[in-house]
Amino acid sequence: MDAMKYNDLRDFLTLLEQQGELKRITLPVDPHLEITEIADRTLRAGGPALLFENPKGYSMPVLCNLFGTPKRVAMGMGQEDVSALREVGKLLAFLKEPEPPKGFRDLFDKLPQFKQVLNMPTKRLRGAPCQQKIVSGDDVDLNRIPIMTCWPEDAAPLITWGLTVTRGPHKERQNLGIYRQQLIGKNKLIMRWLSHRGGALDYQEWCAAHPGERFPVSVALGADPATILGAVTPVPDTLSEYAFAGLLRGTKTEVVKCISNDLEVPASAEIVLEGYIEQGETAPEGPYGDHTGYYNEVDSFPVFTVTHITQREDAIYHSTYTGRPPDEPAVLGVALNEVFVPILQKQFPEIVDFYLPPEGCSYRLAVVTIKKQYAGHAKRVMMGVWSFLRQFMYTKFVIVCDDDVNARDWNDVIWAITTRMDPARDTVLVENTPIDYLDFASPVSGLGSKMGLDATNKWPGETQREWGRPIKKDPDVVAHIDAIWDELAIFNNGKSA
């Protein structure tokens, strides 16, 4: 993979500006609702990243819509365009289950992958840009950061792109995760992480191992894009997000130890929040407008107390909004879709394509096309999608089609469903499965059903009827009409000869 070189977020913004992918907004704009409205209109039009240089009431600029197009996601992952993200997926598939070289020629072919692994270790710095300014104790005031309020009925300002860094008591490597954080005081945020997410698991293990002790947490804002995207990519459990970011960037990820704890944060981050979670301290979070297009219900989550704020000189606050697709998470889903395909194909070689339509909230519905090889094959693939990667444990609907269907064309998919499916025979319903906490359609919070649709041609054993033969054109006739098509002038005002 030929990486697009950048060292930090500011380098990346310079790169975007050179390519016409960044717009500076000098007009004063309010972080309360107004930035969301502008960013939403811009994203829906496929517009640039936005740097609001004069947010009303604040001296700190706000960066929004950074990953508002698949192209910018690809650029953030070191690639020129979205199609190149298949190579990222192939690398992840290799790292997930590396195969030893079969001989000298195979070793030579795999050499680029082995060389990339050299960029995996982090580089620890003693001093770092993210610690150029340090605020602690009573001077900590999160209200000085232009935290956005995105929707009219949101409970409070919300940090959306915080890269939360944690470490469990029995783990060597840290976990990086993106969890939203509600502002509830000058030094307090609500850490909304679901119980199965890495940060929450680290916290649960800490509470069991160290009853009553404070759990150290740090949150990086404005890290370099490779590190941010590493936190939302299906990285193998044996690989740290920092290591993966190094692979994407082509250089080792630079980190620095926090001022108040032993966690390591991206050295070039714009802002770092350091602090702790007091065991048992929780607060009601929400409601907030979410990526589903609805306000979610209120629930209790741990409170994150901020003891230190470190930042760069002239720091930039990186933010986003979530709402009914398309939004930034939906765009990320479109780009990361290309990363998923090679990973799935490594486990299931019969998969031809895999598509997560953004209008399905990026993960709730999947369309898979396969080279079908036996009766019941489609059902095996459904079960594989639901179980192989944890990213798809919340996928409610899986549609499986043959490889003559374009998974990304609804006309094709609907045709396959309506001509190759019997609703009773070809629908799989699975009850009492993990479901997204935000899915209010499920009968119980976090627990619901899944549906698989087998829209493949049926094999012997799956049907007793003679199966339909698809209509195919005569290639000789097609070639002849191609040759005389322009002469026919059907779509021209002139008359045919």
Swiss-Prot record:
- Which reactions does this protein catalyse? a 4-hydroxy-3-(all-trans-polyprenyl)benzoate + H(+) = a 2-(all-trans-polyprenyl)phenol + CO2
**Mind listing the UniProt keywords for this protein, alphabetically?**
Cell membrane, Decarboxylase, Flavoprotein, FMN, Lyase, Manganese, Membrane, Metal-binding, Ubiquinone biosynthesis
How is this protein positioned relative to the membrane? Peripheral membrane protein
Q: Which GO terms describe its cellular component?
A: cytoplasm; cytosol; plasma membrane
Which Pfam families does the entry link to? Answer: UbiD, UbiD_C, UbiD_N
**Binding residues annotated for prenylated FMN, in chain numbering:** I178, Y179, R180, R192, W193, L194, R197, G198
Q: How is the cofactor bound?
A: Binds 1 prenylated FMN per subunit.
Q: What is the required cofactor set for this protein?
A: prenylated FMN; Mn(2+)
Activity control, per UniProt: Requires phospholipid, a metal ion, dithiothreitol and at least one other so far unidentified soluble cofactor for maximal activity. Inhibited by EDTA.
Give the superkingdom in one word: Bacteria
The residues that the entry says bind Mn(2+) are N175, E241
Top enzyme class, one word, equals lyase
Q: Does the keyword Aminoacyl-tRNA synthetase apply?
A: no
Give the Enzyme Commission number: 4.1.1.98
The residues that cross the membrane are: none
Provide the effect of G452R. Answer: In AN66; inactive protein
Q: What Gene Ontology molecular-function terms does this entry list? A: 3-octaprenyl-4-hydroxybenzoate carboxy-lyase activity; identical protein binding; manganese ion binding; prenyl-FMNH2 binding
**Which positions are catalytic residues?**
D290
PANTHER family the record matches: 3-OCTAPRENYL-4-HYDROXYBENZOATE CARBOXY-LYASE-RELATED (PTHR30108), FERULIC ACID DECARBOXYLASE 1 (PTHR30108:SF17)
Its function, per the record, reads: Catalyzes the decarboxylation of 3-octaprenyl-4-hydroxy benzoate to 2-octaprenylphenol, an intermediate step in ubiquinone biosynthesis.
Cite the record's note on assembly. Answer: Homohexamer.
The protein's name in its UniProt record: 3-octaprenyl-4-hydroxybenzoate carboxy-lyase
UniProt lists the gene as ubiD
